[in-house]
Every structure is written in C-alpha cells, then in structure tokens.
UniProtKB/Swiss-Prot annotation:
NQR complex catalyzes the reduction of ubiquinone-1 to ubiquinol by two successive reactions, coupled with the transport of Na(+) ions from the cytoplasm to the periplasm. NqrA to NqrE are probably involved in the second step, the conversion of ubisemiquinone to ubiquinol. This is Na(+)-translocating NADH-quinone reductase subunit B. The modification FMN phosphoryl threonine is found at T233. The keyword Protease does not apply. One of its GO terms (biological process) is respiratory electron transport chain. HAMAP family: NqrB. The gene is nqrB.
C-alpha cells in the first residue's frame, strides 16, 4: 500500500463526524505538505499563478537559508576568536554543552578551525533557539486551528525562522519561547490569524523581548557566545566614535565596509550578512512574493533621510555623519527591508501605498538610529510603526482614486 493510498484510506476518520475529527487540522497539514490537494472546482477557476500560499511560504522560508547558514558560521567564528583572545577555551568546553558537543564531534575550536567547525559550533547555538521557537509556535498554531476548526497555515514557517534570525545567539530558550507566544498569540491569533494581523508577528515578538528583557537582547555582552566577553555592535561603536571607531571587538582591526557587507562582525544571528540577505531577497522578488516597490521605497527614504542628517551635521552625535551605504549594511536594515517590510499581510496593498509605506520605514529607521540616544538600531520600531499606517496609506490612495474618477465624469 502506497503512502498516498494510506492517507486517502484514513481521511474519512478525520472529516466532520469521524472518530478523529478534532485532529483534522494536523491531518490536513501533513497530507497537503506531502501531496497536492485533490479538490477541484465545480466551475471554471480563475488561476493567475500556480504558486499557492503553502508553496509561497515555503519559498520564503528557503530564501532565508543563505542568511541562516552564514549566521551559524559567523556565530562560531566570532566565538572561537573570543575564546582564543580570552584564553578560556577549556573552561568553555567544560562549562557549556555547545562547546562540549562540538568538541566531542571533532570540531576544531582553535584559531585554525575550518568553516565546518565554525558552522558546527554556531549550529549548537542557533538550532536550539530555532527549534524552541518552531515547537512553541507550532503548538499555538495547531491549538488555534483545532479550536477554530480550520486548516493549519504555513505562515509560521516564515515567522519562526525570522524570529530565530533576529535574536542574539546567547538568548535564553525560555525567553525565546515566551517571545514566540507573544508574537503568535497576541500579535496574530487574537486578531484572527494569518491574513488578519496588522503587525509582523516576528517583529512584535522581538519588540516584546526588547522591552521586557533588554539585558538579553541588547548591550555589549550578548552578541558573542563566549563567557566574560564584551563587545559592542558596529552601530553602537559608530554612535560613540564615528567611522573611525569601527573596530573588530576581538582583533581590534578596523571594520571595512566589505567586512560589514559580507558579515564578518558580531550581531543578531541572521542580520550580519547583507550579501546573504540579497541572495535570498532576489529569490522572493523574482517570484513576485516581495514587492520591489516597498524595497525601493525603503531605500529612497533611508538615502534621503541620511543625506539630510549628513547635511545638518553634529559635533556631538557621530551618527549624523553616517552615509547611506553604511546604514544599508549595519544592524538589521537589510533583513528588515527585504523580509519584514515586504510582509504581504502587514504591509500596504495598493501600489502607491507601498511606495509611501516603504519611504516611511526608511526615513523612520534612520531617524530612530540617529536621534534616539538609547537605542542605535531603528529598523524594528520603524517597521512596526509603519504597520500601523499601512491601512491609512491604502485608504488615502483609494479615496484619491475615487475623487479623481468623480472629477473626470463631472
């Protein structure tokens, strides 16, 4: 008996009135993940694209893999550099299961380590965070699907990996679980679930962490997975000493623009490599999942606002002098622009609205980075702020079109 035939045989038990009716959501999710649904329309269908929502979410999930794999590599690379500088490798192996497991699997944790050893060490930090987020979020998704008697949506594939990529590698797992609960339940399911949430769940979860547990999501001690090591992010360094203050926190060597573009700097797991993010973004833009108008709008808003601050200048705030091409490669700007701002649910729907929505994000991100003395990163708050205005932009665009058509027919 083939797998497909077995699924078809047991399906009646999960349908309304069947013995396992309450488990239909899990059955449907498994069956449609393995095979294309066998349902057909009774009349002519209007198919504009063969890419359904399930495949779209999976494609976005896969497009984040370049940033994920590089992020794991960078976490391991930064940790190895730090433990060597501190001379604490043996203490790390005896005191942290991540180092102990990597060492037991044959990883070289010295400066001569190859990419595989660095990737393995980074994976021991990233995968537990990702699995915690995925399992906790999956639990809430299944629970709400069963209570509301609808199919499980694949949107959490994207939410889970995004949230795992925008946190530091040292985040406690219980905080990851708590943030996931907030993002899924409060920011999405309370408003009706996928397609009805007005803000990005992954960003809402990170905002919850930032305001509830700032010590574990910001500061100088959370970005490198090594005990006793303290090192500021590149954005924080610029806020203190300008471009001349950009130094590798371990080696003390100057950070070049190419270092930041490739991702040879500490930071949140998936935010460091703009190059990897561009590769993934090219996939979803080519597939017409992400709106190029929003991306272009974010760039326009960022370039215009940073140029304005460059012209104004400041003798006390070095961030006024940061050019747009540094804003692009530092912090979470690239990840936010390509994968958060373009979220089709919480973004503007109309074409003109997408332009204004993107411009607002770019401008607000730079404004918060430069003017806010307490928090040099502004992309998270900028996107959440723009999420609130997305319906307003769409409303204004629609009303303007109505007025124009009325005036045309007078």
């Amino acid at each position: 008996m083939g797998l497909k035939h077995f699924i078809e045989k047991i399906e009646p038990a999960f349908l309304p009135g069947g013995k396992y009716e309450k488990w239909y959501a899990l059955f449907e999710a498994t069956a449609t993940f393995l095979y294309t649904p066998g349902t057909v329309t009774h009349k002519a269908s209007h198919v504009r694209d063969a890419l359904d929502s399930k495949r779209m979410m999976v494609l976005v999930w896969l497009s984040l893999f370049p940033a994920m794999f590089y992020g794991m590599y960078n976490v391991g690379a930064q940790a190895i550099l730090a433990t060597d500088a501190l001379g604490t490798l043996q203490q790390a192996i005896s005191g942290h299961w991540q180092y102990a497991l990597s060492h037991a699997l044959g990883a070289d944790l010295t400066l001569s380590a190859g990419w595989a050893s660095k990737m393995l060490l980074g994976a021991t930090y990233f995968l537990p965070i990702y699995l915690t987020i995925f399992l906790v979020g999956g639990f809430w998704e299944v629970l709400f699907a069963m209570v509301r008697k609808h199919e499980i949506n694949e949107g959490f594939f994207v939410t889970s990996i995004l949230l795992a990529l925008i946190v530091p590698p040292t985040l406690p797992l219980w905080q990851a679980a708590l943030a996931t609960t907030f993002g899924v339940v409060v920011a999405k399911e309370i408003f009706g679930g996928v397609g009805k949430n007005f803000m990005n769940p992954a960003l809402a979860a990170r905002a919850f962490l930032f305001f509830a547990y700032p010590a574990q999501i910001s500061g100088d001690t959370v970005w490198v997975a090594a005990d006793g090591f303290s090192g500021a992010t590149a954005l924080s360094q610029w806020a203190v000493g300008g471009e001349a203050g950009l130094k590798h926190v371990v080696t003390g060597q100057p950070i070049t623009w190419m270092d930041a573009f490739i991702g040879n700097i500490p930071g949140s797991i998936g935010e460091v490599s703009t190059l990897a993010l561009i590769i993934g973004a090219a996939i979803i833009v080519f597939a017409r999942i992400a709106s190029w108008r929003i991306i272009a709008g974010v760039m326009i808003g960022m370039i215009a606002t940073s140029a304005l601050f460059n012209l104004i200048g400041s003798s006390t705030n070095p961030l006024f002098a940061m050019p747009w091409y540094w804003h692009f490669v530092l912090g979470g700007f690239a990840l936010g622009m390509f994968f958060m701002a373009t979220d089709p649910v919480s973004a503007a729907f109309t074409n003109k609205g997408k332009w204004w929505y993107g411009i607002l994000i770019g401008a607000m991100a730079v404004l918060i980075r430069v003017v806010n003395p307490a928090y040099p990163e502004g992309m998270m708050l900028a996107i959440l702020f723009a999420n609130l205005f997305a319906p307003v932009f769409d409303y204004l665009v629609v009303q303007a079109n109505i007025k124009r058509r009325r005036a045309r027919n007078v």
